[in-house]
């Protein structure tokens, strides 16, 4: 990656996001087509002798796309409807596709990366704070909806048996 001119990545940013959405959807569809249940983790896309962890490609794509978007729409970023909302819709779409894999930690990290780029790029802090608050209101019940996830979260914060559920 040291030899890649980062300025040339701007041209590919929209295509990278589109490609990421396609492969994230394809990953889940392939696992469902193979007869696995909806809740079975579907994080790898196997293409013959090759395998891809599609969320890693999505992470790279979000980083490139958000940087591209901030540069392209810098003057509109303070406006929620015309500047911030389109970027958030793309970000949350990618995050949602990763959550259904299910891979909550990667979705969370991608969200943090995207929000930080938007903030550094000049997005309104109060608007980002409202979006973050709303995301927590939606995200916490989803995270706590399954017993094993709730136990892992509680063990992470030291509220559970560390030798059992929290051991990795």
Model feature map: region roles:
Residues 1-101, 163:
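Membrane-helix boundary/helix-loop-helix interface segments in multi-pass membrane proteins
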Residues 4, 99, 107, 148, ...:
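Residue-level signal for short amphipathic helical patches enriched in basic/charged
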Residues 5, 25-26, 119, 139, ...:
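Hydrophobic membrane-targeting signal helices
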Residues 7, 68, 106, 127, ...:
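Short helix-terminus and kink motifs of transmembrane alpha helices
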Residues 14-20, 81-99, 104-144, 155-156:
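Hydrophobic alpha-helical segments of polytopic membrane proteins
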Residues 31, 54-60, 121-129, 152-153:
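Short, highly charged low-complexity linear segments
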Residues 36-44, 129-168:
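Hydrophobic, glycine- and aromatic-enriched re-entrant/interface helices and adjoining loop segments
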Residues 65, 69, 114, 152-155:
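Alpha-helical scaffold segments in soluble metabolic enzymes
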């Amino acid at each position: 990656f040291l030899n890649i001119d980062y300025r040339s990545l701007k041209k590919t940013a929209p295509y990278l996001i589109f490609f990421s959405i396609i492969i994230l959807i394809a990953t889940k569809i392939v696992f469902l087509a193979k007869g696995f249940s909806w809740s079975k983790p579907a994080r790898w896309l196997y293409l013959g002798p090759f395998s891809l962890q599609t969320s890693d490609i999505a992470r790279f794509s979000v980083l490139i796309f958000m940087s591209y978007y901030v540069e392209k729409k810098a003057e509109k970023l303070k406006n929620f409807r015309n500047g911030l909302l389109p970027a958030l819709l793309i970000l949350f779409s990618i995050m949602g596709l990763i959550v259904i894999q299910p891979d909550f930690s990667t979705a969370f990290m991608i969200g943090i990366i995207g929000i930080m780029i938007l903030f550094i790029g000049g997005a309104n802090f109060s608007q980002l704070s409202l979006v973050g608050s709303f995301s927590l209101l939606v995200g916490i019940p989803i995270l706590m909806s399954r017993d094993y996830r709730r136990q892992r979260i509680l063990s992470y914060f030291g509220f559970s048996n560390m030798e059992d559920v929290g051991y990795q």
